[in-house]
Amino acid sequence: MNGIPFEHGLIVAAILFSLGLCGLLIRRNLLFILMSIEVLMNASAVAFVVAGSRHGQVDGQIMYILVISLAAAEASIGLALLMRMYRRHHTLNVDSVKEMHG
């Protein structure tokens, strides 16, 4: 049974990465920035799996598990910081928080 072609998998990973990067650069809401970082991490994880399947090794799947666990830790810490920032400043806009500090 053949999977998807190598080039198609990398194209999907590149599209996901570019969407995450656009969200990271365009959005000013901290929640959307955190979601964009998650999309970036998932794109790199997909690239690891595709590269591992190309060479017939399970290293890509092992790296996928590592990236997913890292993303879970990053999400929990990021959401805790997000809740703290919202309680303190009553906004999630990154620009307005920068202006408050002077």
Swiss-Prot record:
Enzyme's top EC category: translocase
Biological-process GO terms, alphabetical: ATP synthesis coupled electron transport
Entry keywords, A to Z: Cell inner membrane, Cell membrane, Membrane, NAD, Quinone, Translocase, Transmembrane, Transmembrane helix, Transport, Ubiquinone
Reaction equations catalysed: a quinone + NADH + 5 H(+)(in) = a quinol + NAD(+) + 4 H(+)(out)
Subcellular location per the Swiss-Prot or TrEMBL entry: Cell inner membrane
Transmembrane intervals: 6-26, 30-50, 62-82
Family under the similarity heading: Belongs to the complex I subunit 4L family.
Protein task: NDH-1 shuttles electrons from NADH, via FMN and iron-sulfur (Fe-S) centers, to quinones in the respiratory chain. The immediate electron acceptor for the enzyme in this species is believed to be ubiquinone. Couples the redox reaction to proton translocation (for every two electrons transferred, four hydrogen ions are translocated across the cytoplasmic membrane), and thus conserves the redox energy in a proton gradient.
PANTHER family: NADH-UBIQUINONE OXIDOREDUCTASE CHAIN 4L, NADH-UBIQUINONE OXIDOREDUCTASE SUBUNIT ND4L
Protein name: NADH-quinone oxidoreductase subunit K
Species this protein is from: Tolumonas auensis (strain DSM 9187 / NBRC 110442 / TA 4)
Gene expressing this chain: nuoK
